Amino acid sequence: MTLASQIATQLLDIKAIYLKPEDPFTWASGIKSPIYTDNRVTLSYPKTRDLIENGFVETIRAHFPEVEVIAGTATAGIPHGAIIADKMTLPFAYIRSKPKDHGAGNQIEGRVLKGQKMVIIEDLISTGGSVLDAAAAASREGADVLGVVAIFTYELPKASQNFKEAGIKLITLSNYTELIAVAKLQGYITNDGLHLLKKFKEDQVNWQQ
């Protein structure tokens, strides 16, 4: 079993991901979605947490061997990033969604040196907007952002477009395609549900039609 399928299995088992193609969720954007993800709960399950953190470390070593600092996005990327930095004996920092409105007005908390090679940790990629904003902030502070590594992606076309336009490399430990395949295999969804989930990936607006 691949790492992607192992993580997909764990996310379903601990209910970090819910699939309801026949009774969809409503995202903050107003989009009706057959999937809901809360990867924060992975921190409460040591087996799942270890699988994810070890996966992060292996992936970073394979794709970004020159990394010098790990950064987490506030707030979901902070705990994972801190654990990864500890495992890799690397400095850690975190990136706020916007600068503080008091004190020194920092957006990056921690010490990042000019030109330091950074990998940013995120828990979930939908369109990628927030983590790309974080990457831009890190670049403005002088970091050399090598890429983003995340637990899971919905594989939305908008995300691919956004990362391509930003020139930022994205790697995820698991993904939507792997997840729905595992969900069908393990009986979480029906054939009809699988069909709807595939349609959502292709067209997030009209998938129910």
Swiss-Prot record:
<comment type="subunit">
    <text>Homodimer.</text>
</comment>
<dbReference type="GO" id="GO:0004588">
    <property type="term" value="F:orotate phosphoribosyltransferase activity"/>
</dbReference>
<feature type="binding site">
    <location>
        <position position="100"/>
    </location>
    <ligand>
        <name>5-phospho-alpha-D-ribose 1-diphosphate</name>
    </ligand>
</feature>
<feature type="binding site">
    <location>
        <position position="96"/>
    </location>
    <ligand>
        <name>5-phospho-alpha-D-ribose 1-diphosphate</name>
    </ligand>
</feature>
<feature type="binding site">
    <location>
        <position position="126"/>
    </location>
    <ligand>
        <name>orotate</name>
    </ligand>
</feature>
<protein>
    <recommendedName>
        <fullName>Orotate phosphoribosyltransferase</fullName>
        <ecNumber>2.4.2.10</ecNumber>
    </recommendedName>
</protein>
<feature type="binding site">
    <location>
        <position position="102"/>
    </location>
    <ligand>
        <name>5-phospho-alpha-D-ribose 1-diphosphate</name>
    </ligand>
</feature>
<keyword id="KW-0460">Magnesium</keyword>
<dbReference type="GO" id="GO:0019856">
    <property type="term" value="P:pyrimidine nucleobase biosynthetic process"/>
</dbReference>
<comment type="similarity">
    <text>Belongs to the purine/pyrimidine phosphoribosyltransferase family. PyrE subfamily.</text>
</comment>
<dbReference type="InterPro" id="IPR000836">
    <property type="entry name" value="PRibTrfase_dom"/>
</dbReference>
<keyword id="KW-0328">Glycosyltransferase</keyword>
<keyword id="KW-0808">Transferase</keyword>
<dbReference type="InterPro" id="IPR023031">
    <property type="entry name" value="OPRT"/>
</dbReference>
<dbReference type="Pfam" id="PF00156">
    <property type="entry name" value="Pribosyltran"/>
</dbReference>
<dbReference type="InterPro" id="IPR004467">
    <property type="entry name" value="Or_phspho_trans_dom"/>
</dbReference>
<comment type="pathway">
    <text>Pyrimidine metabolism; UMP biosynthesis via de novo pathway; UMP from orotate: step 1/2.</text>
</comment>
<feature type="binding site" description="in other chain">
    <location>
        <begin position="122"/>
        <end position="130"/>
    </location>
    <ligand>
        <name>5-phospho-alpha-D-ribose 1-diphosphate</name>
    </ligand>
</feature>
<comment type="function">
    <text>Catalyzes the transfer of a ribosyl phosphate group from 5-phosphoribose 1-diphosphate to orotate, leading to the formation of orotidine monophosphate (OMP).</text>
</comment>
<dbReference type="InterPro" id="IPR029057">
    <property type="entry name" value="PRTase-like"/>
</dbReference>
<keyword id="KW-0665">Pyrimidine biosynthesis</keyword>
<dbReference type="GO" id="GO:0000287">
    <property type="term" value="F:magnesium ion binding"/>
</dbReference>
<dbReference type="GO" id="GO:0044205">
    <property type="term" value="P:'de novo' UMP biosynthetic process"/>
</dbReference>
